[in-house]
């Protein structure tokens, strides 16, 4: 049996009830083009490969690639790419698929946020994503205004995706047992963005300024870009803090900000 590698964040799903629930939430179909991030020992890979016509798995650990390729329970419709997902040219990778894809995986906690940000650049090639991630990260992604977890990642992810939590998962569902709890989330790209169009690069600058000083009032945290009078002009109370603004508020502000070079 494969010994988990700690530096790769390997914690393998073992709870059969949880595995079944996850597969039911993903609800794979025969014609789906499916991508799995980090198949591990194949807890999800094996049952989904029996349903879907095509599944591409990305796995950094060459020993797991060997294990999966030799597994007699996996059909020959599985294509495994042995590479670090963080080093994969995603634009080139997604362009190899004629149709939009579905993505799932139990993400290593140390790369989950960075990886999801990388997917944003190709969100128009994605049907949906189902990820098992650290519960704390899920809370940050899902958080709404006036919530202590609401921040940069909440605004950016919700600008591009409809996000929802499906279930919480006990750490006992994994082997070895991690120190943190997990959640299964679903992310679907907006077919029509519910927020005003905005210059996303400007919004990122604005969000970093606001949330890096989240306990400060907006009149102080955003003073580099807006006067108090300007903030009021956009129908925002300058005494509010970063966590009090809606995504629409941030869109409107970013569309009117001037970044001095």
UniProtKB/Swiss-Prot annotation:
Listed EC numbers: 2.1.1.182
Q: Which UniProt keywords apply?
A: Cytoplasm, Methyltransferase, RNA-binding, rRNA processing, S-adenosyl-L-methionine, Transferase
Reactions listed under catalytic activity: adenosine(1518)/adenosine(1519) in 16S rRNA + 4 S-adenosyl-L-methionine = N(6)-dimethyladenosine(1518)/N(6)-dimethyladenosine(1519) in 16S rRNA + 4 S-adenosyl-L-homocysteine + 4 H(+)
What residues bind S-adenosyl-L-methionine, as annotated?
A: 11, 13, 38, 59, 84, 106
State a single Gene Ontology molecular function: RNA binding
NCBIfam families documented for this protein: ksgA (TIGR00755)
Role: Specifically dimethylates two adjacent adenosines (A1518 and A1519) in the loop of a conserved hairpin near the 3'-end of 16S rRNA in the 30S particle. May play a critical role in biogenesis of 30S subunits.
Q: What is this protein called?
A: Ribosomal RNA small subunit methyltransferase A
- Organism, by scientific name, is Wigglesworthia glossinidia brevipalpis
């Amino acid at each position: 049996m494969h010994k988990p590698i700690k530096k790769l964040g390997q914690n393998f799903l073992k709870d059969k009830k949880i595995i079944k629930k996850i597969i039911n939430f993903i609800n794979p179909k025969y014609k789906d083009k499916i991508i799995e991030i980090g198949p591990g020992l194949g807890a999800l890979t094996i049952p989904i490969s029996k349903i879907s016509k095509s599944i591409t798995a990305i796995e950094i650990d060459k020993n797991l690639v060997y294990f999966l390729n030799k597994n007699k329970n996996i059909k020959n419709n599985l294509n495994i790419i042995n590479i670090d997902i963080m080093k994969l040219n995603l634009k080139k990778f997604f362009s190899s698929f004629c149709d939009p894809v579905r993505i799932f995986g139990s993400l290593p906690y140390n790369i989950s946020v960075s990886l999801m940000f990388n997917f944003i650049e190709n969100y128009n090639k994605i049907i949906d994503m189902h990820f098992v991630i650290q519960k704390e990260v899920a809370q940050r992604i899902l958080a709404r205004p006036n919530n202590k977890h609401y921040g940069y990642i909440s605004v950016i992810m919700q600008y591009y995706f409809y996000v929802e939590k499906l279930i919480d998962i006990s750490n006992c569902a994994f082997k070895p047992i991690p120190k943190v709890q997990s959640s299964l989330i679903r992310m679907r790209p907006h077919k029509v963005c519910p927020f005003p169009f905005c210059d996303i690069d400007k919004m990122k600058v604005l969000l970093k300024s606001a949330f890096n000083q989240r306990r400060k009032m907006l009149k102080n945290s955003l003073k580099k870009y807006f006067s108090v009078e300007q903030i009021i002009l956009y129908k925002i109370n300058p005494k509010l803090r970063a966590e009090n603004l809606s995504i629409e508020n941030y869109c409107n502000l970013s569309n009117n900000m001037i970044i001095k070079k």
